[in-house]
Amino acid sequence: MVKTFSITDIGKKRKLNQDYVYSCETRIGNLPNVFIVADGMGGQNAGEYASKVAVDTMVEEIAHCALQSPVRILRHAISRANTRLRELAAKDVHLFGMGTTVVASTVVGRHLLVANVGDSRLYIISDRIRQITKDHSLVEEMVRMGGIDEKTARHHAEKNIITRAVGADDEVNVDFFDV
């Protein structure tokens, strides 16, 4: 049995909490459970709206998806959320440029499947803390390429510039992790 708890925090820099969380510990569509965290892009229009629309769209798609593979279900749901945000932004100038990060997961048997777009993170906490997702950010790319070390990255002025987001481009590239 899976038990969860979620909480969001506005942090010290923002005036508006752009986080949106969804947790379903029981079957939804063809998934045994699903957990989603989205964080609207802070410097962009309608970040809080983007995160809510993305999660709501994903939940709706997961609930009605005929696909069987958990990877395909999550990829489809994130893709539909991406399309929905792009459609809404095209109709309203106030929504132009909106986007959100997404981390979605499902526990299937003894495996945790994680889908990730952006720089929101999923950690496993047991006897130690282990970061599962990899940030899609400018600074993380600099670390991966050897341009800067992780200590420098933590304080880098551009650490919040993300390279992937749901709603940012016509197609969304999703990373998956199987734990």
Residue positions per predicted region:
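PP2C/PPM-type serine/threonine phosphatase catalytic domain
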Residues: 1-179
